[in-house]
Amino acid sequence: MLSVILLAIALAMDAFSISITKGFTQKKIQKQEILWYGIFFGGFQCFMPIIGYVCGTTIRSFISTYAPWIAFILLLCIGLNMIRESITSSDEKVADIFSFKEVTLLAIATSIDAFAVGVTFAILNISLVIPCAIIGIITFLFSIVGIFIGKKLGDYFGDKFQILGGVILILLGFKILLGF
């Protein structure tokens, strides 16, 4: 259960970072807009592992022998990508308006990692219900909290939290590989 919570926190870091930035840049963000960010980010993070699981289930029988290595490589790549993105994208500008199109695109972009985690769940034959619920709830909460933090503190912490998320994914990859 601790691994699922740590994974959920790691996956939520992209949405959290973006939420901090949105809180900082959208000076007049409304409460319902804050709720929409949480719903979209949490919803996509909840359902993308399911889509990844369905895709991963079709290939499970072919690669079950290599599952720990595949999980490790997927999580390592995702974690390294999160760290790389946090280092290279710190100068992005974010608009001061709310749009469903933008929040949808942001939710998709921040949940691609969750898709890969779903593939890993299929390879390792891990049940989806509880992990997906935890991932969605934690992302929902982190998104809302991130906007409030962004409103108070600005976007200073955004990239650092994304680095932490990448490190957690890499550590989970090693945990799976080593069989702990």
Swiss-Prot record:
Membrane topology: Multi-pass membrane protein
Record's keyword terms, sorted: Cell membrane, Ion transport, Manganese, Membrane, Transmembrane, Transmembrane helix, Transport
Subcellular localization(s) per the UniProt record: Cell membrane
Entry superkingdom: Archaea
GO cellular component, one term: plasma membrane
Any one Pfam family match given in the protein's UniProt record, by short name: Mntp
Membrane spanning residue stretches: 1-21, 34-54, 63-83, 103-123, 129-149, 160-180
Gene Ontology MF annotations: manganese ion transmembrane transporter activity
InterPro entries referenced in this protein's UniProt entry, alphabetically: Mntp/YtaF (IPR003810), Put_MntP (IPR022929)
Subcellular location, principal: membrane
HAMAP family recorded: MntP_pump (MF_01521)
Biological role stated in the UniProt entry: Probably functions as a manganese efflux pump.
Family per similarity comment: Belongs to the MntP (TC 9.B.29) family.
The protein's name in its UniProt record: Putative manganese efflux pump MntP
